[in-house]
Amino acid sequence: MKITNPVLKGFNPDPSICRAGEDYYIAVSTFEWFPGVQIHHSKDLVNWHLVAHPLQRVSQLDMKGNPNSGGVWAPCLSYSDGKFWLIYTDVKVVDGAWKDCHNYLVTCETINGDWSEPIKLNSSGFDASLFHDTDGKKYLLNMLWDHRIDRHSFGGIVIQEYSDKEQKLIGKPKVIFEGTDRKLTEAPHLYHIGNYYYLLTAEGGTRYEHAATIARSANIEGPYEVHPDNPILTSWHDPGNPLQKCGHASIVQTHTDEWYLAHLTGRPIHPDDDSIFQQRGYCPLGRETAIQKLYWKDEWPYVVGGKEGSLEVDAPSIPETIFEATYPEVDEFEDSTLNINFQTLRIPFTNELGSLTQAPNHLRLFGHESLTSTFTQAFVARRWQSLHFEAETAVEFYPENFQQAAGLVNYYNTENWTALQVTHDEELGRILELTICDNFSFSQPLNNKIVIPREVKYVYLRVNIEKDKYYYFYSFNKEDWHKIDIALESKKLSDDYIRGGGFFTGAFVGMQCQDTSGNHIPADFRYFRYKEK
């Protein structure tokens, strides 16, 4: 049996892999998307399904106003003492000299249960992780952020003991590893294996130069000796490898005594207009999760098949377990809660944003702020998980002025998105409008207004993603579809396009309603269809 990479498709970065008995879990970053943290489950490392979003309450994660690519960075999931432990960072400032961020701990006895209220740990840097040593002691590690002009901002990896009894950090933090010449040392995970403590970190930045570095020491506080063939994982030297950006990793030992590495990766597309500065391409699906097998030599881990990472990997000697899909091809909103694959921006889906019961078998969204807001958006979306898919919805919406709009959106962040929306024109009544936001530059390229007939109840909207391009379609009866012949570029919904690669999420598609007049007019969505080709 083979593991086929990536195992978690679409925006699922910074994997923290964990074993509890014979069950395996991967927690990934969600940044500004709510609920916070995605946890996937597997029995065999081959087949995975989404099972939990542990940060469900504003008391656990308050992101209103957080910047693009702020929010939850690099969670660390572990299992010890009969319960799950989750460390996460909430990043409040991403630009400038300072990186204002706060590290928290929540726990739960079951992976999909009601997670505890958070314990605030520190704010000295991001990518925090919790290490449970064999002697019962626990330690927090994180990268240290240094804002000083004459210093490198990545100041090394710090460690500090955590007292579970007192529910706080004790003692003094200590820098135990300053990194290698690759710089940008982050994402620490510590393991006590045999005679050594192994410190796994990410280096080189989370673009194409990304890498996983490992060092070891006989003492937890160091000094740490770097792997003789470091980095143990990177695709920087192999631009033709289908898995790029390989780095930010974590290690698991299976119950069959085999070793694996879960890591971040990206699968670029190469549009015809690629410049020399983007010869590595663009990754609209965001940073995904892959798994490699490890072997040991001279008490050092190595990646089977080469440090660049492989698409196919030998699976562990565990019987296969296949799960049902976590989303239907067509979601007709029959449940009282949103499907687990849907998320909202920064804030939870509450009665303020919408309802699944006020209009039975509909998702009702109340108009709020625009797609450029970082506060209150009525936007329910899911990840692009393929570069070949269709997404479709039907919306009943009766706007009364031009400030009210509802429809289908493809979104990266507040500065990069496209939307096909029902809105209002003073002379024509209900119309369809295509709006493009390209690095915060706006356009509405339809030369001829698309007027919606008065008798039409539902307006049907569809998007077809065709790898490096995508197109919108509309219908007034679900049978006769009209293509809007404007090719939109998938690359513009990628980390690599946004300000030259300074952001960290991926493309989403979903349903949105805005009302900047402040009247909160509702839009009713009859279904949402997502079908990969």
UniProtKB/Swiss-Prot annotation:
Subcellular localization: Cell membrane
Chief location bin: membrane
A GO term from the CC aspect: plasma membrane
Pfam family for this entry, one: Glyco_hydro_43
Enzyme kind, highest EC tier: hydrolase
Reaction it catalyzes: Hydrolysis of (1->4)-beta-D-xylans, to remove successive D-xylose residues from the non-reducing termini
Family annotation (SUPFAM superfamilies): Arabinanase/levansucrase/invertase, Concanavalin A-like lectins/glucanases
EC number assigned by the record: 3.2.1.37
Superkingdom classification of source: Bacteria
Bilayer topology annotation: Peripheral membrane protein
Record-linked InterPro entries: ConA-like_dom_sf, GH43_C2, Glyco_hydro_43, Glyco_hydro_beta-prop_sf, Glycosyl_Hydrlase_43
Record Gene3D superfamilies: 2.60.120.200, Glycosyl hydrolase domain, family 43
Active site feature: D14, E186
GO molecular function terms noted in the UniProt entry: xylan 1,4-beta-xylosidase activity
Induction: Up-regulated by xylose. Subject to carbon catabolite repression (CCR).
GO biological process, one term: xylan catabolic process
Assigned keywords, A-Z: Carbohydrate metabolism, Cell membrane, Glycosidase, Hydrolase, Membrane, Polysaccharide degradation, Xylan degradation
Assembly and interaction partners: Homodimer.
Family statement drawn from the similarity comment of this UniProt entry: Belongs to the glycosyl hydrolase 43 family.
PANTHER family, alphabetized: BETA-XYLOSIDASE, BETA-XYLOSIDASE-RELATED
The protein, known as: Beta-xylosidase
Species in which this protein is naturally found: Bacillus subtilis (strain 168)
Source lineage: Bacteria, Bacillati, Bacillota, Bacilli, Bacillales
